[in-house]
Structures are given as C-alpha cells and as structure tokens.
C-alpha cells in the first residue's frame, strides 16, 4: 500500500549517522539500520528512496 510510504526525515547537514539500530524498510526493498542511513544513501546516489515501513523489509 503506497499510502504508507513517506519521505525519510533527513537532516542533510549530517554527514554521518549514529549507530542506533532502528531498522526501516526502504521503497527499494533494502533494510536500513536507521532512517539517517537511508538519507545518506539518497544523498550519495541522488535518489529519493522512501520509507516503506518501520522495521526490516
């Protein structure tokens, strides 16, 4: 259900992420250890992966 997808809550001034494990499932089907890491991936790859759901994919 795409209604549940949302944009990651990003602080794009951040260049590193904490190590807190709070997994989320990205719309690319990849589990990210936390939302910050999804943001960094988007920034690095110039993509706009959404948050599919909380918890692993």
Swiss-Prot record:
GO terms for molecular function: serine-type endopeptidase inhibitor activity. The record marks 19-20 as: Reactive bond for trypsin. GO terms for cellular component: extracellular region. SUPFAM superfamilies: Kazal-type serine protease inhibitors (SSF100895). It holds the Pfam family Kazal_1. CDD domains: KAZAL_PSTI. PROSITE patterns: KAZAL_1, KAZAL_2. This protein is unusual, with respect to the other mammalian SPINK1 proteins, in having an extra N-terminal residue. Serine protease inhibitor which exhibits anti-trypsin activity. In the pancreas, protects against trypsin-catalyzed premature activation of zymogens. In the male reproductive tract, binds to sperm heads where it modulates sperm capacitance by inhibiting calcium uptake and nitrogen oxide (NO) production. This is Serine protease inhibitor Kazal-type 1. It comes from Canis lupus familiaris (Dog).
């Amino acid at each position: 259900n795409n209604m549940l997808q949302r944009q990651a809550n990003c602080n794009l001034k951040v260049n590193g992420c904490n190590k807190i494990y709070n997994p989320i499932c990205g719309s690319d089907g990849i589990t990210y250890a936390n939302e910050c890491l999804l943001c960094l991936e988007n920034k690095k790859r110039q993509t706009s992966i959404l948050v599919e759901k909380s918890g692993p994919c």
